[in-house]
């Protein structure tokens, strides 16, 4: 399915934590419903204004009944800083959904004991993933790591099994790495999104225990459709694949 480009309307725009925002918008195109792991590109400035590129942001939550989509994002540069100016009633350009997300139907057909692992803003797409898994009859165990203070955790309580948190500072939860919270051998599959070093470590631990692992990669993107090759990642076989088109979700054994 090709991505759609629409003018979306802001319903809410909340400050969640330091430099973390939650943007809720009305997505009017029913034929282009997003799924877990997919992303949209957002633009709240003119075509002749900097930055040149729209900003790719993963889907935090999609509600088909209300046609609303939520984006949990970190304010890290000029583009996301401009997004923070959006307020209720404003319109902005929204293009998507894009990419190959988590194959939830395929996952549910093969696995019952599922671990969802996230780090930092990499936790953003894991809420929609957890919702879709729970809707399919499996409540996954959720393990998230943060630098200092966790955010958006309460919403997992009703749709997940175990919910555990680690922090780098020890301010909340376990003092250490998120990969220390679980044993891959206890699960049929592990689904991961977060900093590259964390995903690489999670993939290694899963490989050692023989547990399948799927990761959602993050790369700077330009076109969002695989044409410019700006977000290419190299597979273990030496092949180049576009994160925006072939991913962002990959079998960890393919990319790590």
Predicted regions and their residues:
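Ferredoxin-reductase
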Residues: 1-88
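Local cysteine-cluster metal-coordination motifs and their immediate loop/turn environment
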Residues: 125, 219-248
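Short microdomains enriched in Cys/His and/or Lys/Arg
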Residues: 246-256
